[in-house]
C-alpha cells in the first residue's frame, strides 16, 4: 500500500485563488489516475465541493472531531492522496494543529508525504505569512504559488526582500499559475464542473454539454500551462504514483470540433 500523501492548499489572506489551485490539483490527479479524496474546510457551505462533489467532504478543521475524520483515516482510506483546501485565514492555525497532533513529526520521519501549496497575494503581508509558516515546514515539500488567476500584480514586492523570506525555508519551490481569460473562468464557475470536464464539453455525470468552443479552448490552454508546472515539480512522483506510459495532456481530454453553423 502506498505511503499516505497529504497536500494542504491555503493562505492566510482571502481572495488569492487557493480553491482554484485545489481544483487544478484534483483535475491533474484524475488525469494521472491517482486516486484522491478532498476536504473542503470552507465550513459549512463549502466551495471546492461544488466542483468535485463525489470526492470532497466539507469539514470544520477547527474541531477535533473533523480533524479525526481527516487524519485518523489516512492509512485506511482507499485513496492514498488527500487534498485539504484550507479556508482563508486558517493556514497558520491548521499547521499548528498538525504540529500538536504529531502529524508534522510523522512527516519528518518519513511515515507520511506532506506538501504545502502556499498561495501568495501581492502584498507584503504574504511575505510575513512565509515567515510564519517556515517553522512548520520541516519534513514538508513547500511550494510558494504566485497565482495570477485574479490578474494579480506582485508590484509591492521588492525582490531582494522576497528572496530573503524565500530562503528561510529549505528546498522551497516557486510555482506560477497564469491568468485565465475572465469570461472563460466565469463560465466554468457558472457551470460548476471541474476544469477538465469543461474542456471535454461534459457535465458532472459525463453527459454531453454545450459549452462555448472558444472558452473551452482558453481553459484547455491555461490548464495545460498549469499542469506543466505540476510536471516540472514531478508532483505525481512526490505522491508516490508509479508512472507507466507518457504523461497525460489536457488535449487528451479533447475539446471536440467547433459547433456547426
Residues covered by each model-derived region:
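Conserved catalytic-core segment of NTP-binding enzymes
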Residues: 89-190
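Catalytic cores of phosphodiester-bond-cleaving enzymes
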Residues: 1, 125-130, 137, 214, ...
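C-terminal accessory "lid"/substrate-recognition subdomains
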Residues: 143-261
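A generic secondary-structure signal
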Residues: 28, 73, 132-136
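Walker A (P-loop) phosphate-binding motif
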Residues: 1-29
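Conserved phosphate-coordination/catalytic loops
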Residues: 20, 61-65, 124
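Nucleotide-state-sensitive switch-loop elements of NTP-binding domains
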Residues: 2-8, 31-97, 111
